[in-house]
């Protein structure tokens, strides 16, 4: 029976998690990785009165308890989104396993990256912006709802975003939405009544900034497209034209980011900022954000910083 000291919860195909596992192996630090898409191939029993979970994976047995578990890397969405392409049985299985993973917060003595309760709270866009203001960071003028405020000007451009990350399925194809630039007149002509949206001040010209926070470490990068700032949502651009340039944040912005992370109880977060007219604006924080591409493109040692936290002696 193997007592698990370091637990990694991810998916079979996840390059970010692969980097962490390789780093832990390089250090000779033992861990157990369990993948959500393989859970029905594992034998798992949580014994409540013993506060212990027993797993059998490929013939090997493992034990997880608050006495021995020291760190957990949790790279998975907090909630499962249903798809029309899934059978009723698959929907039931995935929903129940998702709930089971959320219940692993019973192992509350370990160091989590991130604790699911903190992730759930931090995914709320309105709360993020409120937290940023309390932390002393600027935010774009923001309105949330299904009505266009009277202050919106017809001839001015605004950014429109979803309040939650929407995932759509059309003929078995998964689709996402990005931020969209719209004039005030276009907003008034649209059918906002059907669902709430975020309407924000359009920042231009701007430079997009991605700051990856891991504990006390910050890895900030400026994002350029063909060596210039980007109009609108940089994620819509051809990846081959994007470059990520490391830089140093002002100390007050660093302090504000740490306050946001501490306020939500996050150990890891992907923070988006915008630099416009020499002012730094907080856009959002993603507690389950991608980061592996920054190891290759910006040379950031993010996986090593995460491994440092996971490697509890």
Residue ranges and their predicted role:
Residues 3-11:
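Short hydrophobic beta-strand segments
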Residues 11-23, 27, 32-138:
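Conserved N-proximal alpha/beta basic substrate-recognition cap immediately N-terminal to
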Residues 49, 58, 213-217, 276-278:
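Short acidic-glycine loop/turn motifs at beta-strand connectors
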Residues 24, 155-249:
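Phosphate-binding site of ATP-dependent enzymes
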Residues 6, 158-161, 211-213, 279-293:
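A short beta-strand motif that forms the metal-chelation/ATP-contact edge
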Residues 141, 197-198, 268-271:
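A short linear hydrophobic-aromatic micro-motif
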Residues 121, 127-172:
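Loop-centered beta-sheet repeat module
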Residues 245-255, 259-268, 275-313:
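C-terminal active-site "lid" helix and adjoining low-complexity regulatory extension at the edge
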